[in-house]
Amino acid sequence: MCAEWGKLPVRELASAIGGSLVSGLEDMPARGFSTDTRKLGVGDIFLALRGENFDGHNFLGEAINAGAAGVIVENDTVKPEKFSGKNFTVITVPSTLKALGDLALWWRREWGKKLIAITGSNGKSTTKEMTASILSKQAHTMKTPGNFNNLIGLPLTILSLTSGHSMAVLEMGMNRAGEIGRLTQIANPDIGVITNIAGVHLEGLGDLSGVIKAKAELLEEMHSGTIAILNGDDNATEKLISMFQGKVINFGLGKMNSVRAEDIKRTGEHAQSFDIIFNDERVPVSINLPGVHNIMNALAGAAVAYCLSVSSESIVQGLADFKPLKGRFQVIVLNGDIQLVDDTYNANPSSLKAAIQEIKSFKKTGLLIGLGEMMELGKEASRLHFNAGELVADAGVKFFVALGKHGQQLIEGASKGGLAGAQTCLATNHIEMFDMIKANVKEGDTIFLKGSRGMALEKVVKAIKDHFGVSKGGLVLNN
């Protein structure tokens, strides 16, 4: 591949992003690339990004002091002559954010191997991890690290691809229209996966139709020779199919799906087995996670594998070896036979419903639920939080504590659902939430915590773990 740090001439870098090389030697190779002066290596090119709360142009001095060999800046922000030495590279562009995406697109094309893009309202991170676990059994696979799924994180992930990678599995997130479309242009995927569509990010998208349209940007930007993997059990799929020119493979539990699950069995309190059916093949698999939603995630990953002619053995082993990410329905066994279910990474109405449905099946003496606000729900926020409170009451909870701007609606919904006043509490901070849970939990109980990322309920998780202590055997990563 031509795209290789240490060999890429700065003139080619400038050409890839439509920039003007106003200073520096054209043939000088760019040794590396960074948008963060704290992580910049000697000889790297520093790209000065701008955001709502930061401006990389304010850190050009730090970049130089860290050993940067050049900078990419927006037009008219700096004067090239301020940089001493003719060997120092200065490239100017209209937008450094667009330049980052354009460079990643060029890099992806030069890399030229199979790339899978995954989006959806729920389950995209778990599906990404499952898919990468499967593919890595057969080939060296790059996957999105953490939550690098936006207009900055996805390009940076692509720019870390090397000739040693045979495949890439990238996650795409969004909270407003146009983001998925741009991410798809940059990633140029061979396979696109939409896990499901639900009423999330309503603040930026308006309603479910807006969500469907935003997620469909993935399909609209993919070319006719590509493959779309869609949730055949999702009501939105029919609309999505009409927006795509390529081949479609559906997954789900319904008989009409190309990839489906049969003979589902619970093999432990937090594990299950099932058969994956594809064409005439039946493949028995096991996953160390509970819930139908995780079967759907596994089916999506298996569908990707089938499209890439990955062996059934790799599917079986990849799913068996899969370990979920922190804060995504992790079961932690505490002293006193207390189960703490950490689902604090994020929350929306549909993911909360699926999680509570699964919690209801747990063996437990009593159930305590702590919920943080579900953000970005727009004008529907009050109603959806009230409904979530009713859902909590229906779960047979013995104590419920809520936190956040719409915490009162959660409590009101729980009261409407039948919870007495002594069974509910509206906390004003993380410490209060922890104190209420600590005062009401008994031996053998299960504690379930969930909230939007911005609520940072992992602080409550830490406080509970520190207070009660993790039992011998430690963290049960859903097994």
Name what the model sees in each region.
Residues A69-G70, K114, S166, D190, ...:
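Short acidic/polar active-site loop segments enriched in Thr and Asp
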Residues V73-K79, G232-A236, L253, G404-Q408:
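Short, polar loop motifs at secondary-structure junctions
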Residues M1-L21, V42-I45, D55-N58, K86, ...:
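ATP-dependent carboxylate-amine ligase
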Residues R11-S15, L97-G232, A236-F244, A305, ...:
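Phosphate-binding loop of NTP-binding sites
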Residues C2-A117, T126-K137, L159, Q330, ...:
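Short, basic phosphate-binding NTP loop
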Residues L161, M174-L202, E238-P284, L325-R328, ...:
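Extended acidic/charged loop-beta regions that coordinate divalent cations
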Residues G24-F33, K98-G101, N149-I152, M172-A177, ...:
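Short gly/ser/thr-rich secondary-structure transition/capping motifs
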